[in-house]
Every structure is written in structure tokens, then in C-alpha cells.
Amino acid sequence: MNDDKTERPVKTANQRGAARLAAVQALYQMDVGGTGVLEIVAEYEAHRLGQEIDGETYLKADAAWFRSIVSGVVRDQVRLDPLIAAALQDDWALSRLDSTVRAILRAGVFEITDRKDVPVAVIVTEYVEIAQAFFDDDEPKLVNAVLDRIAKQVRGEPKK
């Protein structure tokens, strides 16, 4: 048995997952607090990604992936929101969703539409897991259904 306490490097996939979570948190903060994209990206890169805050250590994240998601969602929100609204049930408006759910959906839809190099299954699974970190049952199911509908529409493929 090895008692060596050396820190293992975080795998790239895990760094992307951490970047996705941080992007959702940043998008939420922007939505609720009205913070600008440049300010929020600078704050996260300087003080959160891989840093310790109040005794909690944030996972090391792929900073470029984080920037890509946050800036892409902000840049393309007028294109992303109608896709999300169309994928929601008839009686649900995007504005009616919780801010965290909106942030998760916007980030997930951005990746589905703009990151063709990432399989749909990876994107949907990662964002459903993020939803499960914040919510119990209905919201993760909603995230799964909406992202799956949009993936079929945009890429012609469901998650596998």
C-alpha cells in the first residue's frame, strides 16, 4: 500500500467538468447580480478556479474552457434562448425557470451548438450532473429533456 500523499494531476476531462460547473456559477452570478462578463471571468480566474475560499478548495478547472462557455453564452444568448424556449413545454417560459436552471441550460445549449468536437452524451451527462448538485428530481429531468431535444434538433442525434 502506498501512503504517498503527492497530489495527482487532475485529468483534462475533470478540468472541463470543473470549468462547466464554474461557468454555470458565473452565469448565475451574472444573471442575479448583474455582473459583467469581463469582471466575472477575471474574478473566477484570479480567485476561484483551483483556489481555496473559506476553507473550500475549488477544483482545478480548464480556464480556457470556462472562458469559452461564459463568453460564448453571453455573446450568443439571443440565439440560445429561443432554442431553449422552443424546447420547453408550452406552459413554461424561460423567464419562469430558476436562474440556476437557466444558467445550466444556456451553458449546455452553447456547447451542443458550438462544441461539435464534444459528444452530445458527454455534454448532457455533465449538465444533468450539475443540475443534480443543486436540485433533487424535477430540474435534472428538465435539463436532460431540454438538452436532448435541442441536440436532436441541432445535431440530429440524441444522447447515447
UniProtKB/Swiss-Prot annotation:
Name the encoding gene, please: nusB
Q: What is this protein called?
A: Transcription antitermination protein NusB
Q: Which GO terms describe its cellular component?
A: cytosol
What does this protein's UniProt record list under function? Answer: Involved in transcription antitermination. Required for transcription of ribosomal RNA (rRNA) genes. Binds specifically to the boxA antiterminator sequence of the ribosomal RNA (rrn) operons.
Q: Which family does it belong to?
A: Belongs to the NusB family.
Q: Does the keyword RNA-binding apply?
A: yes
- Which SUPFAM superfamilies does the record associate with it? NusB-like
Query: Which controlled-vocabulary keywords does the entry list?
Result: RNA-binding, Transcription, Transcription antitermination, Transcription regulation
> Which GO terms fall under molecular function for this chain's record?
RNA binding
- Phylogenetic lineage: Bacteria, Pseudomonadati, Pseudomonadota, Alphaproteobacteria, Hyphomicrobiales
Q: Which HAMAP family match?
A: NusB
